[in-house]
């Protein structure tokens, strides 16, 4: 299969929405019956985002095969059906690390290692290998045109377009067209300069996607086309909208997919966007609303919980409920008390690392349990629910995780030293293992117990969900906790590790060691989140039983 490439770059400022624009185009092409994949090339020197601060970089999205990747891959999976893998995201750090490893082994036979050709060749090889078997590959280059660190990536995609032929390659450039209220008009000069910068490194954009707070007037589009050397129909307006799921319709209405198909000589039927129309309808026509308290430690940057936020919204669509997320700093729960949790329809404690704010999360789990508020715990959110139950119900005073207190009398959560991965291989870790890439990662099989809420929600006795953690329930203390009434509703493939717990004496109290948010999509939702939001709605209406 011959693969065609669309290279996506950004100019003027960062955070323009390259990932959303690229994913929206991919969704339209997929709706035309094409097999589409996406890639994200990140110019930073970290080998992967796994050890980066969530408040700097946002969440780490985990793929089925266990890659710790950029959050844009989450957008990709929410917009298209293709599952991302470790081949769909790589960084400058990964490229340099591998090239240097080859140099140390002598693979280059004593050659002087340079950015061109060695680094650029490695980038090109990764793009080609990661896109095989697809009609179209949309390749997003992170950062902004003009950044020093992105130059090797820009040179690599320029070379690749020449090598595969311009009939198989397109460049789509996102740029900002600001509106100046004082002048009463949009300004095209930043776009012109951004394209000039792109031209200086040998790339002529084929499509310009212009970000603005309004549609770009026809005369300004004509001006952009003239001075940026693109056809007028290739100047696409991408105005601000109240939902990112409206973007596919917005760009399709301007013929972006037709431009792509014409360029690549693809004869494909018109896109059927009925599923996206249904999503937009559900979002615009809720029958009620709920307020979910998200108790975390990275709340200053909501993108740190991007997939959780989106999964809650998806569940709202399935229940025809508008979901309001109230971010609660877990340290505020410690200092101000559980009063900050009052008035919430449900409580969610997401994943996290480190002991800052941990007691606040434990208090949130206690508040939800005692006040019969629907509770969903994810990863660390399951562990704090278990710790709280052990302390206050099972009589294990001072129970804790060894992550936060190595000397606790009741280490109900401890470091996993061994587990079986999705392929049946035994993975081992110790406390001396590196931080990067050493967690239990990727999709794992989970057995659900009969008669549990988890089994009822999923409608199956086995599921596959994605993991990202180092600590697990201590099986030595598990019988004591179960005897006190807590139900283990999910177990790992070898039935040794606790994957889900729930409280049978509570209307809706479920927690999972895995990350269900990574597999939620706007079109399909996710059973765990859908059940959670349904319970929140019942609680809001006073109908929770």
From Swiss-Prot:
NCBIfam families: PRK05380.1 (NF003792), PyrG (TIGR00337)
InterPro entries: Class_I_gatase-like, CTP_synthase, CTP_synthase_N, GATASE, GATase1_CTP_Synthase, P-loop_NTPase
Annotated Glutamine amidotransferase type-1 domain residues: 291-542
Keyword Magnesium: yes
Gene name of this polypeptide: pyrG
Region of interest (Amidoligase domain), ranges: 1-266
Entry binding sites for L-glutamine: 352, 380-383, 403, 470
Additional observations: CTPSs have evolved a hybrid strategy for distinguishing between UTP and CTP. The overlapping regions of the product feedback inhibitory and substrate sites recognize a common feature in both compounds, the triphosphate moiety. To differentiate isosteric substrate and product pyrimidine rings, an additional pocket far from the expected kinase/ligase catalytic site, specifically recognizes the cytosine and ribose portions of the product inhibitor.
Record note on quaternary structure: Homotetramer.
Protein name according to UniProt: CTP synthase
